[in-house]
Amino acid sequence: MQERSVDPRALGAAAVKAAKHRGVDVSSGSEVTEILISDGSIGGVRTDKTSYAAPVVVNCAGAWAGNLGPQQFPTRPVKGQMLSVAGGPRNTPRHVIRSPEVYLVPRSDGRVLIGATVEEAGFDKRTDPATIEQMHRAALHLIPALGRARILEAWAGLRPGTPDNLPILGPMPTPGYFVATGHFRDGILLTPVTAHVMAQVVTGAKPEYDISAFSPVRFQA
């Protein structure tokens, strides 16, 4: 079976556009600094710019999720460095290629993504030139013609890790407070099913899938 890939940036932009089309108010460029409590239940969120009142809050803050809200839970950032190069007709793979050192992901716009590291480096999102060069060399070992490709970009992201390497999904003890995080390297791939099951949980419906093993309260003594 041929392996496919998803462009997280394109998917994110499309999701925002679709949400706005359905009448959802989207606020970007603001940092959530506090989850508000009112009479023992969720009251909304405070950002670095304003506050929003709401009876339900879903914490999807990734590696930062565990430090927000009335009850904390263990999440940690796991750094991943990547780079992209400008592919061409003769050096762009038609499918995902993997080796023990690196993987290559072709994009529809001609780019080739090369990744990715797994680093316990805290919230440091800086790229390391030596690491980027090492991944580039590993990619050239798989496709030597990429040596003629121009490096377009290098970046680092922070994946949300958990102590047992499982996602954190479901309600917290505070009424109206829900969590969806901890997907590590598979967050973008699990977005559809996560959104589907969390919508059921938030609206009080029985989840289509059993997510009890992912409950955020499993970490509480």
Which ranges hold each PLM region?
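Active-site catalytic microenvironments for nucleophilic, acid-base chemistry
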Residues: A18, C60, W64-N67, V197, ...
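Active-site substrate-recognition segment that forms the wall
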Residues: Y52-P175
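Generic structural signal for well-ordered, non-membrane alpha-helical segments
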Residues: R4, P8, G12, D128, ...
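Helical element adjacent to the flavin cofactor pocket in flavoenzyme catalytic cores
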Residues: M1-D48, Y52-V56
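C-terminal catalytic lobe of FAD-dependent flavoproteins
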Residues: I143-A221
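Hydrophobic/aromatic beta-strand patches that form the interior of the parallel beta-sheet core
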Residues: S27, V58, F178-A180
